[in-house]
Amino acid sequence: MIRDITIGQYYPVKSRIHSLDPRVKIVCTLLFLVSLFIQSSFLGYVIATLFLGTVIHMSKVPLKYIVKGLKPIVILLMFTVVMNLFLTRGGEVLLHFWIFTITEEGVRTSVFMALRLMHLVAGSSLMTFTTSPNGLMDGMEKLLSPLNKLHLPVHEVAMIMSIALRFIPILLEETDKIMKAQIARGADFESGNIIQRAKAMIPILVPLFVSAFRRANDLAMAMEARCYHGGEGRTRMKPLKYKGRDKAAYLITIIYVAGVFVLGKFVPFRVWIF
């Protein structure tokens, strides 16, 4: 389960999506995530799936990596579906048993929430799969650069966010190593109730925190050794510059979001339900 979390991992390969400006990927990902919350139709999610599937194909990231990232949220998905299925009221009653009632609106809401969560995770994972940590930091810093006029530490904020994302797979790998070492010593993380499992995690947390602080200290020393003193006066070997493909990506994403919005607002329910 730990190794299935893919957010923060980078998949190096040459593709059209990898070659896009990091700012384009960040903004387009945010627009895609926003579009998921204005979806109000099954057809809208079909279009979202086709859009995301096309981008995944163009990125050359294996589909198994995207699917792998969905495994950690299976329990959350099941919980969300069950809660919405039995607690949402409205529409025709499809099934009634004891105190449980399943309605048409409950089925619709549970399916929508499950699809939304899967698309959220897949879209976010794809951005980190196709954007290097340095590119991600440069893109965020450039997007937030107008805040420099307010004397906000934009470079430092972008650096912190980039390091935090980069540390996710590192800490997950470290957790996996510690768990395997504890299991080899006879530790049991699977049996027992919730409290017993929580207590069993204590031998993992202590060495994990020690390792995290050690890695953070090593990173700080490496940055100091390279005379890093923040973003002031710092130059880049490859300055970010928009190209034709970046503008095309913006245009395609805006058309997609606009189409989803129009579909949800102006197309009658019975037209798009199937």
Which role fits each region the language model picked out?
Residues M1-F42, A48-S59, S145, K149-L152, ...:
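Transmembrane alpha-helix interface motif
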